[in-house]
Amino acid sequence: MPSSAHLQDPPPHLSRTLTQDEEQTSLRQSSSCGPSTTSASASESLSGSTKSRISQKKLLEGMLPKIIPTESAAKLLCCYAVFMALTVVVIALSIALSVKKTPQISAVNTYAACQRNWIGFGNKCYYFNETARNWTFSQTLCKEQEAELARFDNEEELNFLKRYKGSSGYWIGLHRESSADPWKWTDNTAYNNLVPIKGEEKHGFLSDNGLSSGKDYIKRKSICSKLNSYTSQCP
């Protein structure tokens, strides 16, 4: 039995040798594992840095879509403000120009309708009395209707009376004191001699030949006239 136990236990020097070999082997394994651990740590560090950069990139990419629309909105608001300002300026200029042009536009007079049996022309109403009377009585009839024997102030009114009267002669409001005196209207304002009056008598009438003078007592038809009320309107 002692010999068998002795055979199983290695010699002391061999045991130490094995132990040293195991330690060296362990050290080699440890040294061989060391770089792997360091490499893993470096890889983990590199991976963390890459992830950090990727996260920052994503953060920037996430912010850019928000920043760009904000800048675009600001630009749009600025453009809108400029557009509105220009619109206001254009409207103001248009109004100013229209106001300046307004005095150049001739106003058209819109006259109220003349009363029944009266005819409107220009700013007057005319009544053609078909009953023959002398000049004085004809003037009285006109006054009863708040009018006077007819007066014309321009060639247009005279031509209207000549066209409308037909072929008959009509008393009008011209008269004078004598053949040497100037002609006047019934309100005693001077006649402007727009058309010469033929004859030497003191009372005027409208004939086919234009304006003529006749005796007061001759009976003729007559024309009354009076100013018409009106309101001025733009065309």
From Swiss-Prot:
Biased composition, class Low complexity, residue ranges: 30-50
Extracellular side: 97-235
MF terms in GO: carbohydrate binding; natural killer cell lectin-like receptor binding
Positions of the C-type lectin domain: 121-232
Side of membrane Cytoplasmic, spans: 1-75
Keywords: Cell membrane, Glycoprotein, Lectin, Membrane, Receptor, Signal-anchor, Transmembrane, Transmembrane helix
Entry-linked PROSITE patterns: C_TYPE_LECTIN_2
Chain intervals for the UniProt region annotation (Disordered): 1-50
Keyword Nucleotide-binding: no
Glycosylation-annotated residues: 134
TM stretches of this protein: 76-96
PANTHER family named in the record: C-TYPE LECTIN DOMAIN FAMILY 2 MEMBER D-RELATED, C-TYPE LECTIN DOMAIN-CONTAINING PROTEIN 180
Function field: Lectin-type cell surface receptor.
Protein name: C-type lectin domain family 2 member D-related protein
Phylogenetic classification of the source organism: Eukaryota, Metazoa, Chordata, Craniata, Vertebrata
